């Protein structure tokens, strides 16, 4: 059991409560000695006058290996707040990507965007969200939404949670100090954070501004993939995932609680901080992971293997071997395959691919795809390296290995069509000339010369 004594939320400096190591472990942590009840979950009187509250992330009857829940011991139950009211205004968040939803027809074109501009007005993490694309429906608990965020103000008297799905946050610029009910995550670019569905949190920006990506998973919880013949180690190792120790604040005042439900934002007055969980135990909790710890697998003979070797996390579907969402990264790595076209090959995919770039250059695109930008190649849309990359990769000496060092790209790959929103198709950040990167590919065919 981990114990801490952090009792106030101070966003002006890094957190001090520390972390517990492992993925979806049965964690136990308390900020006051003896705050966790002994040998039971819901005693008649919890220690320190706390309330016992269960937070369920799966059905009660889910198989034990998939069942996710945590018991929280808090100063006030989560039910203590005023009624919610609908937040009116611009619909920048989308949660229904079916034909009845507010999305335009999905083009088969390859799409690419420049980074989302930093806001001109003070904007926090929640107000800085905009939905770019997605599939399925939050109401049906199936599919996902892909958002971008750009913010320049910390959340001080405001708290947020999404009832629609768990949030996979990929920072591209600026650190995020994320305080949650279950403890604090300090996250920087090259790291990711996952906030479970329903967990309340606030984000501070120690660098003054931040930008990045969010994949909101409506469906089955993210998990580590099976490794198959890779063996018992490799890819994202469980020990490198960090879940926060308990820390709490007992603070009263005039605050705002914002809820996201079915793609709409709702607000309620709340007279205390929801970060009042003094102790908790269970396996449903926020976590972070450093992408630089990924154990990259690749070919040491010939050919470029399928990108599934770069899989970090997956959300499984009801079809064995077919994931609803794959989170894949393209990290720094050595390329050693001989007589092989080493960049990612030309491809048409039954799945749909939304890509982002955290740092550097993606090895399949010489220019145009920049950090903070994004691209979308939907089902059966042809894509691959641009003309300049193809010419260079076709001429290099493959008897010598080379290192792709200055990069960190990622992909949200889904089994169903990723439908861009009206914002994504109308924004000035959409690169109208993206298709031109392939128009320079020359005809090399000569039937007289093999």
Curated annotation (Swiss-Prot):
Cofactor(s) the protein needs: Fe cation
InterPro entries assigned to the protein according to its UniProt record, in alphabetical order: HgmA_C (IPR046451), HgmA_N (IPR046452), Homogentis_dOase (IPR005708), Homogentis_dOase_bac (IPR022950), RmlC-like_jellyroll (IPR014710), RmlC_Cupin_sf (IPR011051)
Sorted UniProt keywords: Dioxygenase, Iron, Metal-binding, Oxidoreductase, Phenylalanine catabolism, Tyrosine catabolism
Keyword Metal-binding attributed: yes
GO molecular function list: homogentisate 1,2-dioxygenase activity; iron ion binding
Catalytic reaction annotation: homogentisate + O2 = 4-maleylacetoacetate + H(+)
Top EC class of this enzyme: oxidoreductase
Disulfide bonds: none
Active site: 304
CDD domains: cupin_HGO_N
EC number(s) stated in the UniProt entry for this protein: 1.13.11.5
Pfam families: HgmA_C (PF04209), HgmA_N (PF20510)
Top-level taxon of origin: Bacteria
Record carries keyword Amino-acid biosynthesis: no
Protein family according to the UniProt entry: Belongs to the homogentisate dioxygenase family.
PANTHER family: HOMOGENTISATE 1,2-DIOXYGENASE
Reported function: Involved in the catabolism of homogentisate (2,5-dihydroxyphenylacetate or 2,5-OH-PhAc), a central intermediate in the degradation of phenylalanine and tyrosine. Catalyzes the oxidative ring cleavage of the aromatic ring of homogentisate to yield maleylacetoacetate.
SUBUNIT field: Hexamer; dimer of trimers.
Protein name (database record): Homogentisate 1,2-dioxygenase
The species this protein was found in: Burkholderia thailandensis (strain ATCC 700388 / DSM 13276 / CCUG 48851 / CIP 106301 / E264)
